[in-house]
Amino acid sequence: MADLDKLNIDSIIQRLLEVRGSKPGKNVQLQENEIRGLCLKSREIFLSQPILLELEAPLKICGDIHGQYYDLLRLFEYGGFPPESNYLFLGDYVDRGKQSLETICLLLAYKIKYPENFFLLRGNHECASINRIYGFYDECKRRYNIKLWKTFTDCFNCLPIAAIVDEKIFCCHGGLSPDLQSMEQIRRIMRPTDVPDQGLLCDLLWSDPDKDVLGWGENDRGVSFTFGAEVVAKFLHKHDLDLICRAHQVVEDGYEFFAKRQLVTLFSAPNYCGEFDNAGAMMSVDETLMCSFQILKPAEKKKPNATRPVTPPRGMITKQAKK
């Protein structure tokens, strides 16, 4: 592991941030051995910390990024680049967007630089069978090689699965599981692990809330379940929690409440895949556990030769929401 001692994190972060202000899409080509070092060192840190993180406010929580690197940089511009703010990301760093490598490398670099202030959970796309298909494998193969993709897989298999903020906000990528009776069950999951096709770990990364379901329902994804508002209320009451914070679904405003504000979905990739007009959002949790939302507005759609009124530059809108 002598190579890890030579890992120059500051230089890696500096190069990844140099493209700020460049035209979106400009790549940062790190050396292969640097990326390998990021995977190995962050993996070590993930395994040294709990699989169920216990975090303290204040912090900022972000949903799916999906390789939209320049939008990730915008999130940090609005929220403050680490270590100015503490962060928790809810997974789905790779696939679908054009710059999964820059995205995951910056996040892993910040994890290594600020291990007690910067946290990354596992999403359903941090799984070999998924990111083999939806873009990350192809990006690794095109820009580096398949061996590097396998190194990322070894790292992803060690990511934490859930977090609880100040004993009151339960955070995971997907949602609840009919198998989840005690937090101890999450703590007992051994890493490294792949994501199974069913069961607790699968559900935490794959399930979805559904306002039309009573109890548990079938999931259109063909994986895991959907769950209704009553499931949320019972879970919160049983574990003395106030809120579930999850990602995993595109929502128009970047955030969306469910079950009388007992659950919030966060999605942080605006104009997702270039196909949606959604905003992206980040949730700020202050010391009193008041939650507010910072919104990344979607880019204006350019209409050829159409005259349109001048609009102020797109930017941040903060909405207060009492929890």
Curated annotation (Swiss-Prot):
Record text on activity regulation: Inactivated by binding to URI1. The phosphatase activity of the PPP1R15A-PP1 complex toward EIF2S1 is specifically inhibited by Salubrinal, a drug that protects cells from endoplasmic reticulum stress.
InterPro entries assigned: Calcineurin-like_PHP_ApaH, Metallo-depent_PP-like, PP1_catalytic_subunit, Ser/Thr-sp_prot-phosphatase, STPPase_N
Which residues make up the binding site for Mn(2+) 1? D64, H66, D92
**Modified after translation how?**
Phosphorylated by NEK2.
Name the PROSITE patterns for this protein: SER_THR_PHOSPHATASE
Q: What compartments host this protein?
A: Cytoplasm; Nucleus; Nucleus, Nucleolus; Nucleus, Nucleoplasm
Give residues where Phosphothreonine occurs.
Answer: T307, T311
Explain how, and how many, cofactor molecules are bound: Binds 2 manganese ions per subunit.
Q: Where is this region: Disordered?
A: 302-323
Q: Which domain of life is it from?
A: Eukaryota
Keywords on record: Acetylation, Biological rhythms, Carbohydrate metabolism, Cell cycle, Cell division, Centromere, Chromosome, Cytoplasm, Cytoskeleton, Disease variant, Disulfide bond, Glycogen metabolism, Hydrolase, Kinetochore, Manganese, Metal-binding, Mitochondrion, Nucleus, Phosphoprotein, Protein phosphatase
The conditions that induce or repress this protein are given as:
Up-regulated in synovial fluid mononuclear cells and peripheral blood mononuclear cells from patients with rheumatoid arthritis.
**What is its EC class?**
hydrolase
Q: What EC number(s) would the UniProt record show?
A: 3.1.3.16
MF (Gene Ontology): lamin binding; metal ion binding; phosphatase activity; phosphoprotein phosphatase activity; protein domain specific binding; protein kinase binding; protein phosphatase 1 binding; protein serine/threonine phosphatase activity
Please give the Pfam families that the UniProt record associates with this protein.
Answer: Metallophos, STPPase_N
- Entry annotated with the keyword Chloroplast: no
Q: Which residues carry this modification: N-acetylalanine?
A: A2
Which residues does UniProt mark as catalytic?
H125
Reaction(s) the record says it catalyses: O-phospho-L-seryl-[protein] + H2O = L-seryl-[protein] + phosphate; O-phospho-L-threonyl-[protein] + H2O = L-threonyl-[protein] + phosphate
The subunit structure is: PP1 comprises a catalytic subunit, PPP1CA, PPP1CB or PPP1CC, which is folded into its native form by inhibitor 2 and glycogen synthetase kinase 3, and then complexed to one or several targeting or regulatory subunits. PPP1R12A, PPP1R12B and PPP1R12C mediate binding to myosin. PPP1R3A (in skeletal muscle), PPP1R3B (in liver), PPP1R3C, PPP1R3D and PPP1R3F (in brain) mediate binding to glycogen. Interacts with cyanobacterial toxin microcystin; disulfide-linked. Interacts with PPP1R3B and PPP1R7. Isoform 2 interacts with SPZ1. Interacts with CDCA2. PPP1R15A and PPP1R15B mediate binding to EIF2S1.
What protein family is recorded? Answer: Belongs to the PPP phosphatase family. PP-1 subfamily.
What is the role of this chain?
Answer: Protein phosphatase that associates with over 200 regulatory proteins to form highly specific holoenzymes which dephosphorylate hundreds of biological targets. Protein phosphatase 1 (PP1) is essential for cell division, and participates in the regulation of glycogen metabolism, muscle contractility and protein synthesis. Dephosphorylates RPS6KB1. Involved in regulation of ionic conductances and long-term synaptic plasticity. May play an important role in dephosphorylating substrates such as the postsynaptic density-associated Ca(2+)/calmodulin dependent protein kinase II.
Identify this protein by name: Serine/threonine-protein phosphatase PP1-gamma catalytic subunit
